[in-house]
UniProtKB/Swiss-Prot annotation:
UniProt name for this protein: Uncharacterized transmembrane protein DDB_G0286729
Predominant cellular place of this UniProt entry's protein: membrane
Annotated TM spans: 92-112, 122-142, 147-167
Originating species: Dictyostelium discoideum (Social amoeba)
Subcellular location: Membrane
Membrane-protein topology: Multi-pass membrane protein
Lineage: Eukaryota, Amoebozoa, Evosea, Eumycetozoa, Dictyostelia
Region described as Disordered: spans on this chain: 1-22
Keywords, alphabetical: Membrane, Transmembrane, Transmembrane helix
Domain of life: Eukaryota
One GO CC term, this protein: membrane
Length: 261
């Protein structure tokens, strides 16, 4: 009978075919879809400092400036000149109770000039008149025989001493002010002065990425669990195929093992 071109004829052989043992292998591998040619990397952010290019000038107005020694002394003079008020008021009180008005009016007049001027000669003269008034008053009170007048004289002597100490500080400040040169700092405008400040470049922090490789541990790798093969082993046997001219052609064709259930 004839054989078609697309039909296969199995030829049994006398040699027994040994069944190949089934082997199972466990494969460990790392995913290469994300990092096919290099290790995985972690991108960290590290701050870097850059300088701003802004150099705009700004003007600041300060109150009660202290730009040099002269400014400091002038501020002290403004407050210490009130130390002349106490002696001047005491001289006015003595003037009202005195019988020689013209003589006792000289000291209060010097006190007015000492309060509104910074002339050291006038201030020193008024200080001497105030010291004379205080000493004269204490001596007059001590001359009494009563205890009240003696206690009053002690109290007045303490007050007069404190007043003269404050007055002497005012005179010392005027002497220091006279020996200090002129202020060559910023221009004074009223109670404050303008200071021109040239702004310096401001540092700005910009995060920069840092690439750091990440280590891979065995516990992080995917694992393929071996599964038992459910397919039976295949047997490869030679097969003869005839072409159109009826020439035999041998092929190796796998067939199922009929002995396995």
């Amino acid at each position: 009978m004839g054989v078609a071109d697309n039909e296969y004829i199995s030829v049994p052989t006398g040699e027994p075919v040994q069944q190949q043992p089934q082997t199972t292998s466990v494969v460990f591998g790392a995913p290469q879809s994300y990092y096919p040619h290099q290790q995985p990397q972690i991108i960290l952010s590290a701050p870097t400092t850059t300088a701003s290019t802004s150099t705009t000038d700004s003007t600041v107005v300060e109150e009660n400036p202290v730009c040099c020694d002269r400014c400091d002394l002038e501020n002290k003079v403004k407050y210490q000149r009130y130390s002349t008020v106490g002696p001047w008021l005491y001289q006015i009180i003595i003037l009202f109770f005195s019988q020689q008005f013209l003589l006792f009016s000289i000291a209060p007049i010097l006190g007015l000039f000492a309060m509104y001027t910074q002339n050291r000669c006038i201030v020193v003269m008024h200080f001497l008149t105030a010291a004379f008034y205080y000493i004269f008053s204490v001596i007059f009170l001590f001359s009494g025989d009563q205890i009240n007048t003696i206690l009053l004289s002690i109290l007045f002597s303490i007050i007069f001493t404190l007043s003269l100490m404050n007055y002497s500080r005012y005179i010392k400040t005027l002497n220091k002010l006279a020996n200090v040169g002129e202020c060559l700092q910023s221009t004074i405008n009223g109670s404050g002065f303008e200071v021109t400040i040239e702004s310096q470049p401001t540092p700005t922090t910009i995060p920069q990425p840092i690439v750091q490789p990440q280590p891979i541990y065995v516990s992080q790798l995917p694992m393929m669990i071996p599964q038992p093969s459910s397919q039976p082993p295949q047997i490869i046997v030679p097969q003869i195929v005839y072409d159109a001219n009826h020439n035999p052609i041998y092929h190796l064709i796998p067939i199922q093992n009929s002995n396995q259930h």
